[in-house]
């Protein structure tokens, strides 16, 4: 743009954090395959020729072409004018539809989530190594992942590896006592991928000792158990939810073309019925130029597909 407009352009990026987290690497951080710093990049280092503002977007006024933000320690509202706007607000987590899930499930959205999950798994192993109660030990050594998308598949594989590597330090835990379960409500995992690749992933996970349950959802959960839609009661102290994505609250109240809370764009990423607004990432419904095997007409909201 600077070349085309001969430097008569000002670009500003607004983000809640001053760093970028590559979410597909969070399972590796949780599993210890990579360090946290490998999944994080400072925005000012990545993008040096634009203005970066650490702030939270509150609302967008299309008529007046302004964005209202909260910034600073006192979170004072500020109104920013724009000529052109790119919306990349991603998605939020909403686990409230399933009783108990919001209160008891771990998630995989942020760097802190990955660190928390790793610490939680180690704590469960520590507890299982010393307890004399069989039921408590069973719950501590049962790890349940909900969701068979990219995040769920990567997470379940990484935590299984972490547990397997750690067992040599816990003499009172046998490998046969470990149970790692993946629950997927659909009839297959990795719906974003061709069926052949999904089947390959399933076989790999099964060989590593992961138990996959398809066509199975969650009815409710507590801090000590999970009840599936088939009626099975799983004694578990670890529930990891990679489901429950919901639209950004900012987009929900923005009067613009949407489908299930995601912004409708054309193949140039321009928002429908607008001239100066674009949208990218999780919050956009992006049409595909070609339809690969087993895919819908729209691109899945995953970084892997974008790359």
Kindly give the residue locations of the regions a language model identified:
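FAD-binding core/adjacent interface of flavoenzyme oxidoreductases
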Residues: 51-144, 162, 240
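Short, well-ordered coil/turn residues at beta-beta hairpins
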Residues: 70, 88-89, 216, 229, ...
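A Rossmann-like FAD-binding core segment of flavoenzymes
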Residues: 52-66, 160-267, 271-273
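Hydrophobic/aromatic beta-strand patches that form the interior of the parallel beta-sheet core
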Residues: 12-14, 53, 86, 106, ...
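Beta1-alpha1 glycine-rich phosphate/pyrophosphate-binding loop at the start
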Residues: 1-59, 143-144, 150-193
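Short glycine-rich anion-binding loops that position phosphate/pyrophosphate groups of nucleotides
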Residues: 90-93, 156, 245-247
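FAD-site-proximal beta/loop scaffold in flavoenzymes
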Residues: 103-133, 224-225, 233-307
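Short acidic/His/Gly/Ser-rich catalytic and metal-binding motifs that mark active-site loops
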Residues: 20-23, 94-97, 249, 286-290
């Amino acid at each position: 743009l600077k070349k085309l407009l001969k430097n008569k352009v000002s670009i500003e990026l607004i983000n809640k954090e001053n760093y970028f987290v590559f979410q597909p690497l969070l399972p590796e951080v949780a599993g210890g395959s990579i360090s946290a710093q490998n999944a994080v990049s400072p925005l000012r280092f990545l993008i040096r020729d634009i203005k970066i503002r650490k702030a939270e977007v509150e609302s967008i006024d299309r008529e007046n072409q302004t964005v209202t933000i909260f910034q600073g320690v006192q979170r004072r509202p500020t109104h920013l004018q724009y000529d052109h706007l790119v919306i990349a607000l991603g998605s939020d987590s909403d686990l409230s539809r399933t009783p108990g899930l919001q209160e008891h499930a771990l998630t995989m959205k942020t760097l802190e989530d990955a660190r928390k999950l790793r610490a939680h798994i180690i704590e469960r192993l520590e507890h299982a190594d010393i307890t004399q109660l069989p039921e408590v030990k069973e719950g501590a050594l049962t790890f349940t992942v909900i969701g068979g998308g990219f995040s769920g598949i990567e997470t379940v594989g990484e935590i299984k590896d972490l547990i397997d590597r750690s067992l040599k330090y816990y003499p009172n835990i046998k490998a046969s006592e470990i149970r790692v379960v993946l629950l997927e409500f659909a009839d297959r995992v990795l719906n974003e991928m061709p069926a052949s690749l999904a089947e390959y992933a399933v076989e790999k996970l099964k060989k590593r000792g992961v138990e996959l349950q398809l066509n199975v959802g969650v009815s409710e959960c507590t801090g000590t158990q999970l009840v599936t839609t088939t009626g099975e009661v799983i004694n578990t102290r670890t529930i990891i939810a990679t489901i429950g994505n919901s639209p950004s609250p900012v987009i929900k109240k923005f009067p613009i073309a949407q489908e299930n809370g995601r912004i409708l764009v054309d193949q140039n990423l321009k928002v429908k019925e607008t001239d100066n607004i674009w949208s990218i990432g999780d919050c956009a419904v992006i049409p595909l130029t070609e339809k690969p095997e087993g895919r819908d007409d729209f691109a899945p909201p995953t970084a892997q597909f974008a790359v």
